[in-house]
């Protein structure tokens, strides 16, 4: 039986309390949680949250916690572009799994603020795609996915400091890493053992 989304108490001005869902409570502390596959719906919610939090206070970090198997490249790139657009630093943390577009977003965090819990797994690979229809349409789709693959590899190379040739080789197939391996690779900056007080 599913437990649903937990509700937690929130103290209103004046001393009264009300129960709100935990994700809304986390958002009050500038924490956004990506805990599912990346699609247009979750991308729009994350983008809207980042834009709002940035307009509220561009000097305070936004925290993006990631436990995601990946998903839509276009939706993920929309989140990536927003992370680079907002004035506030976006600190990222892997909590469980950051695979495919999930790992791309993990690496997109502000340099020095990309972290992972010690037993998390991080996986990079090339984008997946498929096409059907007339031969000309399939050719158009093939060119587009190759362009996307090249662009993602270039960004990963820039964000990690790895040579483009290594990124191309490593993303040719699923490439899993431990948190410590991801740190050595340049996907993250720190493996977090304990939360700072």
Curated annotation (Swiss-Prot):
Keywords: Cytoplasm, Hydrolase, Protease, Serine protease. It is found in: Cytoplasm. The keyword Repressor does not apply. The lineage of its organism: Bacteria, Bacillati, Cyanobacteriota, Cyanophyceae, Gloeobacterales. The gene is clpP1. It is an enzyme of class 3 (hydrolase). Belongs to the peptidase S14 family. This is ATP-dependent Clp protease proteolytic subunit 1. Fourteen ClpP subunits assemble into 2 heptameric rings which stack back to back to give a disk-like structure with a central cavity, resembling the structure of eukaryotic proteasomes. The active site is at residues 100, 125. One of its GO terms (molecular function) is ATP-dependent peptidase activity. It catalyses: Hydrolysis of proteins to small peptides in the presence of ATP and magnesium. alpha-casein is the usual test substrate. In the absence of ATP, only oligopeptides shorter than five residues are hydrolyzed (such as succinyl-Leu-Tyr-|-NHMec, and Leu-Tyr-Leu-|-Tyr-Trp, in which cleavage of the -Tyr-|-Leu- and -Tyr-|-Trp bonds also occurs). GO terms for cellular component: cytoplasm; endopeptidase Clp complex. Gene3D superfamilies: 2-enoyl-CoA Hydratase, Chain A, domain 1.
